[in-house]
């Protein structure tokens, strides 16, 4: 059984060493380009031509990143992720990439509040090969120990075998384990505490991706999760301890591969390239494979191949659908539209394959527009209602206090006023601020199996279209800005989405975001603008963990 310990997370991704991320890119120009005024990308191309040329690091729309003498790009990802790759490369939460192959045991990540969980790696030298490879990952949570032996058919052992995994899902203490199928793979989903979950790939690769609710509460080789990329290898004790041994060269094995090894790996990986949905990774994995082949021969190269094939089969990022304002939708695949209508029980998102869950939204009339009245989340026979009036939370029709935990459902407050409802093994997360910000997250098991306003999660926005499931007749959107309103709306909204927001919140579709902001101002005046600014502040925090100041007009 191939194992992945999955994460339910949100986030922000920045490439730190661009030449490492794009090793086969042409040499950068000798002169430093002018810093572009816009970092937006459209259909894989940087809108501003000064934004570099590393097209394979952009998947459709997103952002391009430019640093002096470097040519890289970044995507609009919603995942804070740390990775250990089969070739011995590590990537921290903020994208610092390094190679580390020293035998021993190392803390990849741990909780710093109470020390109630940790993820430890065991690196070993096998059969006299060069360097070391990942052989075991150990997860300790509140007294329970889960050992995952890498590159084996039956890898999981709970508490030394004293607690066999006999059910699906299987729960022990704070940990839930469930096997979910995706095309070509069985995935084991393990979640604990506030959405700290790990992906253990079937070869010798690990990914850990915590929810932003854990900001400032994690340390280890992955980094301290302080939401500050400048902290990498400057403050964390686990990072500093390994620093003398990172990026060590091995005789005859350059990091970018020997030419003959590169050709071998191209032949090994090429048959899988045509069916890879994330083919931007091909060159990166080819060079990683070549390095691994030089270090440990065919066996180690095959683990890189397995890493590549699994990455190809999974979506590039976590599926995120957002409802914001009055009422704007961004689907899982980033189609965007707005509608007004006092619709009851509108299907926002659902598992339309196994019918295990759905998320529905009720709207109500408010003068000339509509807003959210209630969000209903169903998992099998369990129904959770989030009611705006009074911030009521009901499970099975009964009021519950927060935090709440029962079977595979947990509900808790994040950042004071964002309610998070997490459901496993479906890997469904719903975040709602009881106003006009609703975020739905799903993961790999539902790739191509969802329906509703959020669309079919398949990385194809062309098959996402507005469909209210016949629940109501749509009413026209209120008119936009008058000529008198427009100048002030433009001033406020351009200031809200200034250039600093690009880096802090990885803002995609900036012109569209400004238009939405202006719509809110022209709909409800200064109050509409300030409500929108606060919603954006929360959206930025949910997706990327960054905390923004609201405009002075709203303080």
UniProtKB/Swiss-Prot annotation:
Keywords: Decarboxylase, Disulfide bond, Glycoprotein, Luminescence, Lyase, Monooxygenase, Oxidoreductase, Photoprotein, Repeat, Signal. This is Luciferin 2-monooxygenase. The cysteine residues presumably exist in intramolecular disulfide bridges. Its EC number is 1.13.12.6. It catalyses: Cypridina luciferin + O2 = oxidized Cypridina luciferin + hnu + CO2. Disulfide bonds join 82-222, 321-454, 343-493, 352-451. Residues 1-11 form the signal peptide. One of its GO terms (cellular component) is extracellular matrix. GO terms for biological process: bioluminescence. It comes from the Eukaryota. It comes from Vargula hilgendorfii (Sea firefly). PROSITE patterns: VWFD (PS51233). The keyword Glycoprotein applies.
